[in-house]
């Protein structure tokens, strides 16, 4: 069962314009009370590049030690999306 706070790899294609695309980690933010439905609400995660100097108010820093991802990352809260569970590829961590 998908739970709020879980991190999964999702296939976010197809997308339009500047939406986050491809297979990438995402954190589930929808309520556990509705996560049994076919759709869940997620925030995509992107790897943190060494050139990043600022974390913006609509971003959350996610160290690799916490997420179990291979790199320090940033949760992109401004890219909130509802997606079908068929996009779930692989469970990573809670």
Task: Give each language-model segment a name.
Residues 1-94:
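Conserved functional hotspots at enzyme active or ligand-binding sites that engage polyanionic ligands
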């Amino acid at each position: 069962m998908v739970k709020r706070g879980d991190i999964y790899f999702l296939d976010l294609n197809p997308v339009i314009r500047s939406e986050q695309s491809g297979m990438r980690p995402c954190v589930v933010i929808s309520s556990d009370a509705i996560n049994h439905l076919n759709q869940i609400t997620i925030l995509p995660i992107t790897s943190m590049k060494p050139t990043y100097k600022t974390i913006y108010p609509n971003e959350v820093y996610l160290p690799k030690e916490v997420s179990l991802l291979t790199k320090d990352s940033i949760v992109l809260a401004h890219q909130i999306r509802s997606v079908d569970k068929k996009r779930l590829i692989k469970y990573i961590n809670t």
